[in-house]
Amino acid sequence: MNRTQKKTLVLLLGILVGLGILLAVVSAVVMAADCVARLVLPERSAVPCYAPVGCLALVFAMWGGARESRGLWDTFRMAATDDEPPYLVTETEKGACKQAGSVPGFYTTALRENTAAVWQNALMPVVLMASIVFAGLSSLGQERGDDFLLNWSAILGAGTTFALPLCWGMPFSRLARHFHKAGCAVAGWCGAEKISRRRAMILTDGDLFPPGTIQLNGVKVFGEDLSRVSSYAASMARAADCGLQRLFDGLLRSEGGHYEKVDDFSFYEEGGYSATIRGESVLLGTASFMRKMEVRLPGGINLRTGIFLAMDRQLAAVFAVKYQPSENVDFALRMMRRSRITPILASRDPNITPALLKRKFHKGVKVEFPSLTDRVAFSEAELDRGMPRALLFREGLLPYAEAVVGSRRLCKAVRRATALSVLGSVAGTLLSFYMVFQGAYNLLTPLALLVFLLLWALPVLLLADWAGRY
Protein backbone atom coordinates (compact mmCIF):
# COMPACT_ATOMS: atom_id res chain seq x y z
CA MET A 1 0.00 0.00 0.00
CA ASN A 2 1.23 3.53 -0.74
CA ARG A 3 1.24 6.40 1.76
CA THR A 4 -2.17 7.75 0.71
CA GLN A 5 -3.80 4.34 1.13
CA LYS A 6 -2.24 3.95 4.58
CA LYS A 7 -3.53 7.36 5.68
CA THR A 8 -7.01 6.49 4.41
CA LEU A 9 -6.91 3.19 6.28
CA VAL A 10 -5.88 4.87 9.53
CA LEU A 11 -8.67 7.44 9.12
CA LEU A 12 -11.29 4.77 8.48
CA LEU A 13 -10.15 2.76 11.49
CA GLY A 14 -10.36 5.87 13.62
CA ILE A 15 -13.93 6.50 12.48
CA LEU A 16 -14.95 2.91 13.21
CA VAL A 17 -13.39 2.92 16.66
CA GLY A 18 -14.86 6.37 17.40
CA LEU A 19 -18.40 5.17 16.63
CA GLY A 20 -17.86 2.19 18.86
CA ILE A 21 -16.89 4.19 21.96
CA LEU A 22 -19.19 7.19 21.51
CA LEU A 23 -21.99 5.84 23.70
CA ALA A 24 -19.47 4.82 26.36
CA VAL A 25 -18.00 8.34 26.27
CA VAL A 26 -21.43 9.94 26.68
CA SER A 27 -22.15 7.57 29.57
CA ALA A 28 -18.86 8.46 31.26
CA VAL A 29 -19.51 12.21 30.84
CA VAL A 30 -22.98 11.89 32.38
CA MET A 31 -21.57 9.93 35.31
CA ALA A 32 -18.85 12.54 35.82
CA ALA A 33 -21.51 15.25 35.84
CA ASP A 34 -23.43 13.25 38.45
CA CYS A 35 -20.30 13.17 40.62
CA VAL A 36 -20.24 16.97 40.52
CA ALA A 37 -23.98 17.10 41.21
CA ARG A 38 -23.52 15.05 44.35
CA LEU A 39 -21.23 17.75 45.70
CA VAL A 40 -23.32 20.79 44.77
CA LEU A 41 -26.95 19.55 44.98
CA PRO A 42 -28.01 18.97 48.58
CA GLU A 43 -31.35 17.42 47.60
CA ARG A 44 -29.71 14.67 45.54
CA SER A 45 -30.25 11.18 46.95
CA ALA A 46 -27.34 10.09 49.13
CA VAL A 47 -26.28 7.11 47.03
CA PRO A 48 -22.89 6.33 45.42
CA CYS A 49 -22.09 7.53 41.90
CA TYR A 50 -21.85 5.12 38.98
CA ALA A 51 -18.53 6.47 37.72
CA PRO A 52 -16.73 3.07 37.96
CA VAL A 53 -19.29 1.66 35.52
CA GLY A 54 -18.55 4.41 33.00
CA CYS A 55 -14.81 3.91 33.31
CA LEU A 56 -15.09 0.18 32.71
CA ALA A 57 -17.43 0.79 29.77
CA LEU A 58 -14.68 2.89 28.18
CA VAL A 59 -12.17 0.12 28.81
CA PHE A 60 -14.36 -2.47 27.07
CA ALA A 61 -15.12 -0.13 24.16
CA MET A 62 -11.44 0.56 23.58
CA TRP A 63 -10.63 -3.13 24.02
CA GLY A 64 -13.12 -4.01 21.28
CA GLY A 65 -11.67 -1.34 18.99
CA ALA A 66 -8.14 -2.58 19.67
CA ARG A 67 -9.09 -6.18 18.86
CA GLU A 68 -10.73 -5.10 15.62
CA SER A 69 -7.62 -3.13 14.66
CA ARG A 70 -5.47 -6.16 15.46
CA GLY A 71 -7.67 -8.36 13.29
CA LEU A 72 -7.37 -5.94 10.37
CA TRP A 73 -3.62 -5.74 10.95
CA ASP A 74 -3.22 -9.52 10.69
CA THR A 75 -5.55 -9.65 7.68
CA PHE A 76 -3.82 -6.90 5.72
CA ARG A 77 -0.35 -8.14 6.67
CA MET A 78 -1.26 -11.51 5.18
CA ALA A 79 -2.81 -9.90 2.10
CA ALA A 80 0.34 -7.84 1.54
CA THR A 81 2.47 -10.99 1.38
CA ASP A 82 2.07 -11.19 -2.40
CA ASP A 83 0.62 -8.78 -4.95
CA GLU A 84 -0.67 -11.78 -6.90
CA PRO A 85 -1.67 -14.53 -4.45
CA PRO A 86 -2.07 -18.04 -5.87
CA TYR A 87 -5.83 -18.18 -5.27
CA LEU A 88 -8.83 -16.21 -4.15
CA VAL A 89 -12.19 -17.39 -2.83
CA THR A 90 -15.35 -15.79 -4.14
CA GLU A 91 -19.06 -16.52 -3.97
CA THR A 92 -21.19 -18.18 -6.67
CA GLU A 93 -24.83 -19.18 -6.85
CA LYS A 94 -23.96 -22.65 -5.53
CA GLY A 95 -21.34 -21.77 -2.94
CA ALA A 96 -17.74 -20.71 -2.40
CA CYS A 97 -15.39 -21.15 -5.35
CA LYS A 98 -11.60 -21.04 -5.53
CA GLN A 99 -10.20 -19.06 -8.46
CA ALA A 100 -6.95 -17.54 -9.69
CA GLY A 101 -5.65 -14.99 -7.19
CA SER A 102 -6.17 -11.24 -7.36
CA VAL A 103 -5.88 -8.57 -4.64
CA PRO A 104 -7.83 -5.52 -6.02
CA GLY A 105 -11.11 -5.18 -4.16
CA PHE A 106 -9.97 -7.08 -1.08
CA TYR A 107 -9.15 -4.06 1.10
CA THR A 108 -12.37 -2.17 0.40
CA THR A 109 -14.38 -5.32 1.10
CA ALA A 110 -12.59 -5.84 4.40
CA LEU A 111 -13.42 -2.31 5.60
CA ARG A 112 -17.15 -2.59 5.04
CA GLU A 113 -19.36 -2.33 8.10
CA ASN A 114 -20.03 -5.48 10.10
CA THR A 115 -23.37 -6.48 11.54
CA ALA A 116 -22.33 -5.64 15.11
CA ALA A 117 -21.41 -2.09 14.04
CA VAL A 118 -24.74 -1.73 12.24
CA TRP A 119 -26.64 -2.73 15.36
CA GLN A 120 -24.41 -0.58 17.53
CA ASN A 121 -24.99 2.49 15.37
CA ALA A 122 -28.73 1.82 15.37
CA LEU A 123 -28.91 1.11 19.09
CA MET A 124 -26.79 4.04 20.23
CA PRO A 125 -29.31 6.85 19.58
CA VAL A 126 -32.23 4.70 20.79
CA VAL A 127 -30.57 3.92 24.12
CA LEU A 128 -29.45 7.52 24.52
CA MET A 129 -32.91 8.98 23.90
CA ALA A 130 -34.64 6.30 25.99
CA SER A 131 -32.29 6.97 28.90
CA ILE A 132 -33.08 10.70 28.78
CA VAL A 133 -36.83 10.08 28.69
CA PHE A 134 -36.72 7.46 31.44
CA ALA A 135 -34.46 9.65 33.59
CA GLY A 136 -36.91 12.53 33.24
CA LEU A 137 -39.90 10.35 34.12
CA SER A 138 -38.20 8.88 37.18
CA SER A 139 -36.89 12.21 38.52
CA LEU A 140 -38.71 15.26 37.19
CA GLY A 141 -41.92 13.28 36.89
CA GLN A 142 -41.76 12.46 40.60
CA GLU A 143 -40.60 15.93 41.67
CA ARG A 144 -37.05 14.70 42.30
CA GLY A 145 -35.27 16.98 39.87
CA ASP A 146 -31.95 16.79 41.70
CA ASP A 147 -31.81 13.05 40.92
CA PHE A 148 -31.99 13.55 37.15
CA LEU A 149 -28.27 13.04 36.53
CA LEU A 150 -28.18 10.17 39.01
CA ASN A 151 -31.03 8.34 37.29
CA TRP A 152 -29.70 9.16 33.83
CA SER A 153 -26.25 7.79 34.66
CA ALA A 154 -27.78 4.59 36.09
CA ILE A 155 -30.07 3.97 33.10
CA LEU A 156 -27.48 4.94 30.50
CA GLY A 157 -24.81 2.87 32.24
CA ALA A 158 -27.05 -0.20 32.21
CA GLY A 159 -27.90 0.34 28.54
CA THR A 160 -24.26 0.83 27.52
CA THR A 161 -23.53 -2.87 27.47
CA PHE A 162 -19.91 -3.97 27.79
CA ALA A 163 -20.53 -6.78 25.32
CA LEU A 164 -21.54 -4.93 22.15
CA PRO A 165 -18.09 -3.39 21.38
CA LEU A 166 -16.59 -6.90 21.66
CA CYS A 167 -19.08 -8.71 19.40
CA TRP A 168 -17.04 -8.20 16.25
CA GLY A 169 -13.52 -7.36 17.39
CA MET A 170 -12.94 -10.37 19.64
CA PRO A 171 -13.91 -13.23 17.28
CA PHE A 172 -12.51 -11.41 14.24
CA SER A 173 -9.07 -10.90 15.79
CA ARG A 174 -8.98 -14.53 16.91
CA LEU A 175 -9.96 -15.85 13.49
CA ALA A 176 -7.65 -13.42 11.66
CA ARG A 177 -4.69 -14.74 13.66
CA HIS A 178 -5.79 -18.31 12.96
CA PHE A 179 -6.18 -17.56 9.24
CA HIS A 180 -2.71 -16.02 9.16
CA LYS A 181 -1.21 -19.25 10.50
CA ALA A 182 -3.25 -21.30 8.01
CA GLY A 183 -2.02 -19.26 5.04
CA CYS A 184 -5.21 -17.39 4.16
CA ALA A 185 -6.94 -14.06 4.77
CA VAL A 186 -10.66 -13.23 4.82
CA ALA A 187 -11.96 -9.78 3.86
CA GLY A 188 -13.69 -8.89 7.10
CA TRP A 189 -17.38 -9.40 7.78
CA CYS A 190 -18.46 -8.88 4.18
CA GLY A 191 -16.01 -11.44 2.82
CA ALA A 192 -16.81 -14.00 5.51
CA GLU A 193 -20.57 -13.60 5.07
CA LYS A 194 -20.40 -13.88 1.28
CA ILE A 195 -18.38 -17.10 1.05
CA SER A 196 -20.18 -18.88 3.89
CA ARG A 197 -23.75 -17.87 3.07
CA ARG A 198 -24.54 -20.95 0.94
CA ARG A 199 -22.77 -23.37 3.30
CA ALA A 200 -21.21 -25.10 0.29
CA MET A 201 -17.81 -25.33 -1.41
CA ILE A 202 -17.04 -26.27 -5.01
CA LEU A 203 -14.25 -28.88 -5.08
CA THR A 204 -12.35 -29.98 -8.18
CA ASP A 205 -10.03 -32.90 -8.93
CA GLY A 206 -6.96 -31.01 -7.74
CA ASP A 207 -8.57 -30.10 -4.42
CA LEU A 208 -9.33 -33.72 -3.50
CA PHE A 209 -6.26 -35.36 -5.04
CA PRO A 210 -3.42 -32.84 -5.27
CA PRO A 211 -0.27 -33.49 -7.32
CA GLY A 212 1.54 -36.63 -6.21
CA THR A 213 -1.52 -38.45 -4.89
CA ILE A 214 -2.51 -40.00 -8.25
CA GLN A 215 -0.01 -42.66 -9.32
CA LEU A 216 0.36 -44.99 -12.30
CA ASN A 217 0.96 -48.56 -11.15
CA GLY A 218 1.25 -50.12 -14.58
CA VAL A 219 0.21 -50.11 -18.24
CA LYS A 220 -0.99 -52.99 -20.40
CA VAL A 221 -1.05 -52.44 -24.16
CA PHE A 222 -3.17 -54.44 -26.62
CA GLY A 223 -1.60 -54.47 -30.08
CA GLU A 224 -0.44 -50.85 -30.04
CA ASP A 225 2.82 -49.02 -29.51
CA LEU A 226 3.21 -47.64 -25.96
CA SER A 227 4.43 -44.29 -27.27
CA ARG A 228 1.32 -43.88 -29.42
CA VAL A 229 -0.97 -45.01 -26.62
CA SER A 230 0.60 -42.54 -24.16
CA SER A 231 0.26 -39.72 -26.73
CA TYR A 232 -3.43 -40.42 -27.24
CA ALA A 233 -4.16 -40.78 -23.51
CA ALA A 234 -2.24 -37.61 -22.61
CA SER A 235 -3.97 -35.65 -25.36
CA MET A 236 -7.40 -36.79 -24.15
CA ALA A 237 -6.59 -35.97 -20.52
CA ARG A 238 -5.34 -32.52 -21.47
CA ALA A 239 -8.49 -31.85 -23.49
CA ALA A 240 -10.58 -32.91 -20.50
CA ASP A 241 -8.47 -30.73 -18.16
CA CYS A 242 -8.89 -33.31 -15.41
CA GLY A 243 -6.71 -34.57 -12.58
CA LEU A 244 -5.26 -37.30 -14.81
CA GLN A 245 -3.49 -34.74 -16.97
CA ARG A 246 -0.35 -34.59 -14.84
CA LEU A 247 -0.22 -38.40 -14.62
CA PHE A 248 -0.39 -38.97 -18.37
CA ASP A 249 1.92 -36.05 -19.06
CA GLY A 250 4.62 -37.84 -17.06
CA LEU A 251 4.02 -41.04 -19.02
CA LEU A 252 4.15 -39.10 -22.29
CA ARG A 253 7.51 -37.59 -21.45
CA SER A 254 9.00 -40.89 -20.32
CA GLU A 255 7.95 -42.59 -23.57
CA GLY A 256 9.08 -39.75 -25.81
CA GLY A 257 5.60 -39.14 -27.21
CA HIS A 258 3.92 -35.90 -28.20
CA TYR A 259 0.50 -34.32 -27.90
CA GLU A 260 -1.96 -34.90 -30.71
CA LYS A 261 -4.65 -32.59 -32.04
CA VAL A 262 -8.01 -33.49 -30.49
CA ASP A 263 -11.25 -32.85 -32.41
CA ASP A 264 -14.92 -33.28 -31.48
CA PHE A 265 -14.16 -33.75 -27.80
CA SER A 266 -17.12 -34.73 -25.59
CA PHE A 267 -17.79 -35.65 -21.97
CA TYR A 268 -20.03 -38.59 -21.06
CA GLU A 269 -22.15 -38.94 -17.94
CA GLU A 270 -21.21 -42.64 -17.84
CA GLY A 271 -17.63 -41.77 -16.90
CA GLY A 272 -15.43 -41.09 -19.89
CA TYR A 273 -14.56 -38.97 -22.91
CA SER A 274 -14.69 -39.36 -26.66
CA ALA A 275 -12.84 -37.51 -29.42
CA THR A 276 -11.35 -37.85 -32.86
CA ILE A 277 -7.56 -38.04 -33.21
CA ARG A 278 -6.03 -38.46 -36.69
CA GLY A 279 -9.38 -39.62 -38.00
CA GLU A 280 -9.73 -42.35 -35.37
CA SER A 281 -12.53 -42.50 -32.82
CA VAL A 282 -10.86 -42.49 -29.39
CA LEU A 283 -12.48 -43.33 -26.06
CA LEU A 284 -10.94 -42.85 -22.61
CA GLY A 285 -12.71 -43.76 -19.39
CA THR A 286 -13.69 -46.39 -16.87
CA ALA A 287 -14.54 -50.04 -17.48
CA SER A 288 -18.27 -49.39 -17.16
CA PHE A 289 -17.99 -46.60 -19.71
CA MET A 290 -16.26 -48.93 -22.17
CA ARG A 291 -18.98 -51.56 -21.79
CA LYS A 292 -21.69 -48.99 -22.41
CA MET A 293 -19.83 -47.85 -25.50
CA GLU A 294 -19.75 -51.51 -26.67
CA VAL A 295 -16.00 -51.93 -26.32
CA ARG A 296 -15.14 -55.53 -25.58
CA LEU A 297 -12.95 -55.98 -22.49
CA PRO A 298 -10.84 -59.06 -21.77
CA GLY A 299 -11.75 -61.19 -18.78
CA GLY A 300 -9.72 -61.18 -15.59
CA ILE A 301 -9.23 -57.41 -15.44
CA ASN A 302 -10.48 -56.18 -12.07
CA LEU A 303 -9.38 -52.57 -11.66
CA ARG A 304 -11.75 -50.43 -9.62
CA THR A 305 -9.92 -47.25 -10.60
CA GLY A 306 -8.45 -48.35 -13.92
CA ILE A 307 -8.52 -46.11 -17.00
CA PHE A 308 -9.13 -47.73 -20.40
CA LEU A 309 -8.22 -46.42 -23.84
CA ALA A 310 -9.99 -47.60 -26.99
CA MET A 311 -9.40 -46.76 -30.66
CA ASP A 312 -12.19 -47.36 -33.16
CA ARG A 313 -14.07 -49.38 -30.52
CA GLN A 314 -11.08 -51.67 -29.96
CA LEU A 315 -9.33 -51.76 -26.59
CA ALA A 316 -5.81 -50.31 -26.94
CA ALA A 317 -4.50 -49.95 -23.38
CA VAL A 318 -5.33 -50.30 -19.71
CA PHE A 319 -3.79 -47.97 -17.12
CA ALA A 320 -3.70 -49.07 -13.48
CA VAL A 321 -4.28 -45.81 -11.63
CA LYS A 322 -3.99 -45.56 -7.85
CA TYR A 323 -5.50 -42.73 -5.81
CA GLN A 324 -3.58 -42.09 -2.60
CA PRO A 325 -5.59 -40.17 0.03
CA SER A 326 -3.97 -37.14 1.62
CA GLU A 327 -4.18 -36.59 5.38
CA ASN A 328 -4.73 -32.86 4.90
CA VAL A 329 -7.63 -33.48 2.53
CA ASP A 330 -9.16 -35.98 4.94
CA PHE A 331 -8.81 -33.48 7.79
CA ALA A 332 -10.40 -30.74 5.67
CA LEU A 333 -13.35 -32.97 4.72
CA ARG A 334 -13.93 -33.87 8.37
CA MET A 335 -13.78 -30.19 9.30
CA MET A 336 -16.35 -29.36 6.63
CA ARG A 337 -18.65 -32.13 7.80
CA ARG A 338 -18.48 -30.97 11.43
CA SER A 339 -19.37 -27.43 10.36
CA ARG A 340 -22.11 -28.63 7.98
CA ILE A 341 -20.40 -27.26 4.88
CA THR A 342 -21.47 -29.28 1.83
CA PRO A 343 -18.75 -30.16 -0.71
CA ILE A 344 -19.99 -29.85 -4.30
CA LEU A 345 -18.03 -32.30 -6.42
CA ALA A 346 -17.04 -30.61 -9.70
CA SER A 347 -14.80 -33.44 -10.91
CA ARG A 348 -13.79 -34.18 -14.48
CA ASP A 349 -11.87 -37.32 -13.62
CA PRO A 350 -14.32 -40.20 -14.25
CA ASN A 351 -12.95 -42.11 -11.26
CA ILE A 352 -13.55 -39.35 -8.70
CA THR A 353 -17.06 -40.08 -7.48
CA PRO A 354 -18.76 -40.09 -4.05
CA ALA A 355 -18.11 -43.84 -3.85
CA LEU A 356 -14.36 -43.34 -4.32
CA LEU A 357 -14.27 -40.62 -1.67
CA LYS A 358 -15.97 -42.89 0.85
CA ARG A 359 -13.42 -45.63 0.14
CA LYS A 360 -10.39 -43.36 0.31
CA PHE A 361 -11.48 -41.03 3.12
CA HIS A 362 -13.71 -41.45 6.15
CA LYS A 363 -17.00 -43.19 5.43
CA GLY A 364 -19.06 -40.31 6.76
CA VAL A 365 -18.03 -37.94 3.96
CA LYS A 366 -21.05 -36.62 2.11
CA VAL A 367 -20.78 -34.66 -1.12
CA GLU A 368 -23.21 -33.21 -3.60
CA PHE A 369 -22.69 -34.84 -6.99
CA PRO A 370 -24.40 -32.70 -9.65
CA SER A 371 -24.99 -33.64 -13.27
CA LEU A 372 -22.11 -33.76 -15.74
CA THR A 373 -23.10 -30.44 -17.33
CA ASP A 374 -23.10 -28.72 -13.95
CA ARG A 375 -19.82 -30.34 -12.90
CA VAL A 376 -18.08 -29.07 -16.02
CA ALA A 377 -19.59 -25.60 -15.55
CA PHE A 378 -18.55 -25.47 -11.89
CA SER A 379 -15.01 -26.57 -12.69
CA GLU A 380 -14.79 -23.90 -15.40
CA ALA A 381 -15.73 -21.28 -12.80
CA GLU A 382 -12.22 -21.69 -11.39
CA LEU A 383 -10.90 -20.02 -14.52
CA ASP A 384 -12.90 -16.85 -13.81
CA ARG A 385 -11.74 -14.08 -11.52
CA GLY A 386 -14.42 -12.75 -9.19
CA MET A 387 -14.29 -10.33 -6.29
CA PRO A 388 -11.76 -11.54 -3.69
CA ARG A 389 -13.65 -12.34 -0.50
CA ALA A 390 -10.68 -14.34 0.79
CA LEU A 391 -7.09 -14.89 -0.34
CA LEU A 392 -5.22 -18.21 -0.23
CA PHE A 393 -1.43 -18.29 -0.11
CA ARG A 394 -0.94 -22.06 0.21
CA GLU A 395 -1.79 -25.00 -2.00
CA GLY A 396 -4.28 -27.68 -1.10
CA LEU A 397 -7.79 -28.06 0.18
CA LEU A 398 -7.00 -27.27 3.82
CA PRO A 399 -6.46 -23.47 3.51
CA TYR A 400 -9.56 -23.28 1.31
CA ALA A 401 -11.62 -25.17 3.88
CA GLU A 402 -10.14 -23.13 6.73
CA ALA A 403 -11.28 -19.90 5.07
CA VAL A 404 -14.86 -21.04 4.43
CA VAL A 405 -15.41 -22.97 7.66
CA GLY A 406 -13.79 -20.24 9.75
CA SER A 407 -15.92 -17.61 8.02
CA ARG A 408 -19.08 -19.52 8.86
CA ARG A 409 -18.04 -19.84 12.51
CA LEU A 410 -17.18 -16.14 12.60
CA CYS A 411 -20.56 -15.08 11.22
CA LYS A 412 -22.46 -17.34 13.61
CA ALA A 413 -20.48 -16.11 16.61
CA VAL A 414 -20.95 -12.43 15.70
CA ARG A 415 -24.69 -12.81 15.09
CA ARG A 416 -25.25 -14.64 18.36
CA ALA A 417 -23.08 -12.25 20.34
CA THR A 418 -24.82 -9.24 18.82
CA ALA A 419 -28.26 -10.65 19.62
CA LEU A 420 -27.23 -11.29 23.23
CA SER A 421 -25.71 -7.82 23.54
CA VAL A 422 -28.80 -6.07 22.19
CA LEU A 423 -30.97 -8.13 24.52
CA GLY A 424 -28.71 -7.24 27.45
CA SER A 425 -28.83 -3.54 26.58
CA VAL A 426 -32.63 -3.51 26.37
CA ALA A 427 -32.97 -5.53 29.57
CA GLY A 428 -30.52 -3.29 31.42
CA THR A 429 -32.28 -0.11 30.29
CA LEU A 430 -35.74 -1.33 31.35
CA LEU A 431 -34.64 -2.88 34.65
CA SER A 432 -32.63 0.15 35.71
CA PHE A 433 -35.55 2.45 34.83
CA TYR A 434 -37.87 0.36 36.99
CA MET A 435 -35.48 0.41 39.93
CA VAL A 436 -34.73 4.14 39.86
CA PHE A 437 -38.44 4.87 39.36
CA GLN A 438 -39.12 2.91 42.54
CA GLY A 439 -36.15 4.52 44.27
CA ALA A 440 -34.55 1.11 44.89
CA TYR A 441 -30.98 2.43 44.85
CA ASN A 442 -30.02 -0.10 47.50
CA LEU A 443 -30.51 -2.81 44.86
CA LEU A 444 -29.02 -0.86 41.95
CA THR A 445 -25.59 -0.27 43.46
CA PRO A 446 -22.51 0.40 41.27
CA LEU A 447 -21.19 -3.06 42.16
CA ALA A 448 -24.47 -4.75 41.25
CA LEU A 449 -24.56 -2.88 37.93
CA LEU A 450 -20.96 -3.89 37.20
CA VAL A 451 -21.73 -7.54 37.90
CA PHE A 452 -24.83 -7.35 35.68
CA LEU A 453 -22.88 -5.91 32.74
CA LEU A 454 -19.96 -8.32 33.18
CA LEU A 455 -22.30 -11.31 33.20
CA TRP A 456 -23.79 -10.19 29.88
CA ALA A 457 -20.26 -9.79 28.46
CA LEU A 458 -19.21 -13.32 29.49
CA PRO A 459 -21.18 -15.15 26.73
CA VAL A 460 -19.60 -12.88 24.12
CA LEU A 461 -16.12 -13.82 25.29
CA LEU A 462 -17.07 -17.50 25.23
CA LEU A 463 -18.46 -17.16 21.70
CA ALA A 464 -15.24 -15.48 20.57
CA ASP A 465 -13.29 -18.47 21.88
CA TRP A 466 -15.80 -20.89 20.28
CA ALA A 467 -15.39 -19.23 16.89
CA GLY A 468 -11.76 -20.34 16.68
CA ARG A 469 -12.36 -23.97 17.67
CA TYR A 470 -13.26 -26.06 14.61
Where are these regions (language model features)?
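Short, positively charged
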Residues: 173-190, 249-256, 280-290
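Signature of the cytosolic headpiece of P-type E1-E2 ATPases
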Residues: 8-14, 253-355
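Bateman (tandem CBS) regulatory domains
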Residues: 154, 213-217, 229-235, 314-317, ...
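Asp-based phosphoryl-transfer active-site loop
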Residues: 193-218
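Hydrophobic alpha-helical transmembrane segments
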Residues: 6-200, 348, 391-470
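A short acidic/small-residue loop/turn micro-motif
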Residues: 217-221, 323-325
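Conserved ATP-binding TGD loop and adjacent catalytic N/P-domain core of P-type ATPases
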Residues: 93, 277-279, 311-446
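ATP-binding catalytic core of ATPases
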Residues: 99-121, 220-270
